[in-house]
Amino acid sequence: LTGKGIVIEGSGATTILNANMSSNLDIVINDAIEVQGGDRQITTTNGADITITGGNGTANEGIHGTKGEANSLTIDAGTGAVAIGALAGFGDGSDGSLLQNVAVSGGNVSLYSTSHSVSGDFEFNGPVTIGGPTSSTMTMSAANISFQSTIDSAASVLNGLILNSQGLTNISGAIGATNQLGSLTTDAGGTTQLAGGPVNTSDAQTFGDTVELGADTTLSSTNGSISFASAVDSDTTARTLNLSSGSTVSFDTAVGSSNALASLTLAATGTTFADDVTTTGIQNYSTPATLLNHVTFQGGEGQFAGGLDGNQKDLALNFTAPVTIDGSETFGNIANLSVQNNANLSGTINTTGFQNYGGAVTLVGDTTLQGTYGNFGSGLDGQTNNLQLEFSSETEIDGSTVFSNIGDLNSTGAVKLRGTISTTGFQNYGDTATLYGDTTLNTGTSGDVSFGGTVDGSHDLAIEAGTGRIDFFNALGSSTPLQSLNLASASAVQANSTLAIDATGGSGAGL
């Protein structure tokens, strides 16, 4: 039919669609529709609209197929609008069948019904508006679901969207960019591809299936949480993921394990990680993070400005650029901490096990390290900040690389020393000190040096304290005599116990 519009005035009955329907003017169907005898099309041209209300009565059967048939339906308004009314949801009717596939195209597509189901695929070509003027949640179920343009709520309400698919859910446009959705949920099983940029909701975003980023993506929830029950990956191109939540963010499985993200940025009240996170670029966590399992963060750069609760799990930080750990926001309760490369530290960093820093450490603020023992494989630059070491087991301080420019250095546990260790303030070693190489302690112009425990080791020890004091509160060389002792400068020296030196002894102030 061409040249005139088509209007079917129903009263809650069902229109049997057993042929294609087309018009260059508007098509209005005020009935339920049963698709019969094969695949059918409802089309308009010249910008004409298509409206299917589902009927005026209460005996609505929605849009469905004839029982026992596997029919598909195409609704195509071209540049015109498509409206699927509140009583016209895609379903199986009272005694019909689900349609096989449904494709809907239009300049804009309005879906007012709260439920839509097909046995095959849903495809929407054109901007989609969810729901009517009263807040509701729409559930869509299919083998595969595809939105080729934007998805928005009806204006001035916060309608939600649930997508149930065991196959592929592809979203190629922004969600909630014009009118924010209430919530967004995808079920477990299958994959959701986000390829349209931003996703904006008022309440929760819950992704039950695997998420694949096909474009740089920003997920924002004003009041709700954002949760990922399955993996999050890029497609074959590394993508950025920015998350902003007025509540919490949770990752129940790995991020970037199959295809690394370009970057990951988080802002929320808290974030939980149950598996590893891999990016090619920066990971920026301004939110408090909690580990649910042993976790490795790997990427170009890492920033943990919001602090971290290790929940007694191991933490590995493998970043090519220096990782920033800000302990002023609580960075602790970790089992073991391993930092593969360089690190910028400040605040208090607490572990119940070891802390291993494989790269160079730079203090960007006063820093306290607590745990069983610490290892600094490539030295430490204090940048005149204070360093407090509170390790229960022996910790190596190796000045043969760089261990210098520290303000005050205070170690409450046992230490092994070698090389040159330089501070602008005092150096206090509260427990035993063992020399495992020739050692020089330099405290600048006036810093004190004190040893609370014994000092042993068959190596040279030189101390340059300027006008500061040198105090030995326990024996020197009682187990293993020193090779030599050189007290190069000090205002006073106090030795409260015995001194044993194997070779020629030392010289300098106090001797």
Question: PLM features: what roles do these ranges have?
Answer:
Residues 1-511:
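Extracellular lectin-like interaction modules
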